[in-house]
């Protein structure tokens, strides 16, 4: 991920409010849960597609390097695309 994409991803992730709520991605509805911990140093995000078995899961450590993204059991590109292209 280049610096511009990293910055955009970080910004979009921070803009998402903590809690659980519906979002849309590729015309599908997901229940997204976001939790910010350790005074903003760790962001946990999980989204479960409603009506199917797709999901998104990631941990993001904002203060490690330029931000360290750790997807859970899926490609980094999948979680980046989800965060950048979801709508609330």
Task: Show the residue positions of the predicted features.
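Acidic, aromatic-enriched beta-alpha/helix-loop junctions
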Residues: 38-78
């Amino acid at each position: 991920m280049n610096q511009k994409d990293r910055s955009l991803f970080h910004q979009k992730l921070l803009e998402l409010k903590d809690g659980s709520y519906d979002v849309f991605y590729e015309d599908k509805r997901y229940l997204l849960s976001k939790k910010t911990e350790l005074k903003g140093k760790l962001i946990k995000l999980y989204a479960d597609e409603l009506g199917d078995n797709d999901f998104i899961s990631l941990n993001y450590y904002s203060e490690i390097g330029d931000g360290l993204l750790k997807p859970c059991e899926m490609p980094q590109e999948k979680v980046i695309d989800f965060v950048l292209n979801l709508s609330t």
